[in-house]
Amino acid sequence: MASIIARVGNSRRLNAPLPPWAHSMLRSLGRSLGPIMASMADRNMKLFSGRVVPAQGEETFENWLTQVNGVLPDWNMSEEEKLKRLMKTLRGPAREVMRVLQATNPNLSVADFLRAMKLVFGESESSVTAHGKFFNTLQAQGEKASLYVIRLEVQLQNAIQAGIIAEKDANRTRLQQLLLGGELSRDLRLRLKDFLRMYANEQERLPNFLELIRMVREEEDWDDAFIKRKRPKRSESMVERAVSPVAFQGSPPIVIGSADCNVIEIDDTLDDSDEDVILVESQDPPLPSWGAPPLRDRARPQDEVLVIDSPHNSRAQFPSTSGGSGYKNNGPGEMRRARKRKHTIRCSYCGEEGHSKETCDNESDKAQVFENLIITLQELTHTEMERSRVAPGEYNDFSEPL
């Protein structure tokens, strides 16, 4: 026997095909060792009696059920043989329950037997509780739809075990509750509604739990990819706007008319180009008549505008004067109005208010200007001398001759 095993091992190491006699020998060993392995597994299974306090060597119902569910997939036998093996693991009241079930239902299956054992010995929920938990299971805020479907499936299986929902109606009930309590995209919601409408009489063709999970996950992956594609586009557009010189280009000076006298109009908008616009009006502007157009719409020749550019401005850097209407049009349909700040303009040549030296009519008569200045200085000097002659506390009657 040892030589045969050695030859089989050497042939496998050399990747050579096994001879026909080796295959027949392995099948014989499998048939002979199968019952031995099964009996060894049966000996290792714990017992369940259904008593409140388990005896030595016995398990609680939950542990026994977990053990049975673990070995059932390895039992390649008929339903009758499986029930016989399960009978060997029962004692006391649990064994009597199984005998009653077999007597009342000769065609009892393993699934029906386990369901009956859960109802008798398990801690199952009442039908009212299971019904309420399932139909009140809603998607939480921030929860993914796929996680909600998994959480909903747990409550659905509990409701099926409690007997309030038939297993054949599970697909339809799952879809209806998902549409009611889930936050789905518009496309996925329409697809699921179409399924319910088309297969209303063919519930077996509705998507089951795994198919529904796949549909929801595909929709979530598509949404995530779409959001990731959109975010770089938005950031790129913001960067382009940030580096674009057009976004920071200063606006031209804005001049408007006003009925107030001697006002300065300065544009203090956010995109200020450091240019001040001064509007100077005459002392006595004419009153508008009822038939005349509004002041802001007509040109006023008596209005004078002084535009002062900042040193940093790229345009002409010298003051200029112009007459015009009260609004500046920067483009088709674009009219803007600046804020007003009142300030009195005084001419440095003639000393009069209401105009500047650039527009002074007396600019050519400089001799008269100097003469006026000399007279003013003499008057101030004479007044100061008169005050110095009067001692503190004395009364001087200026009506008497000195």
Swiss-Prot record:
GO cellular component entries: nucleus
Zn finger (CCHC-type) start-end: 345-362
What Pfam families does the annotation carry?
PNMA (PF14893)
Polar residues bias spans? 311-322
Q: Which domain of life is it from?
A: Eukaryota
* Region entry Disordered, spans: 308-341
- Segments spanning the bilayer are none
InterPro entries reported for this sequence: PNMA (IPR026523), PNMA_C (IPR048270), Znf_CCHC_sf (IPR036875)
- Could you tell me one molecular function GO term of this UniProt entry? nucleic acid binding
Write out the entry's keywords from A to Z. Answer: Metal-binding, Transcription, Transcription regulation, Zinc, Zinc-finger
Instruction: Quote the subunit structure annotation.
Output: Interacts with SMAD1 and CREB-binding protein (CBP). Forms a protein-DNA complex through its association with SMAD1.
Q: Which family does this protein fall into?
A: Belongs to the ZCCHC12 family.
Q: Which PANTHER family match?
A: PARANEOPLASTIC ANTIGEN (PTHR23095), ZINC FINGER CCHC DOMAIN-CONTAINING PROTEIN 12 (PTHR23095:SF18)
Protein's job: Transcriptional coactivator in the bone morphogenetic protein (BMP)-signaling pathway. It positively modulates BMP signaling by interacting with SMAD1 and associating with CBP in the transcription complex. It contributes to the BMP-induced enhancement of cholinergic-neuron-specific gene expression.
Q: Return the protein name.
A: Zinc finger CCHC domain-containing protein 12
Organism of origin = Homo sapiens (Human)
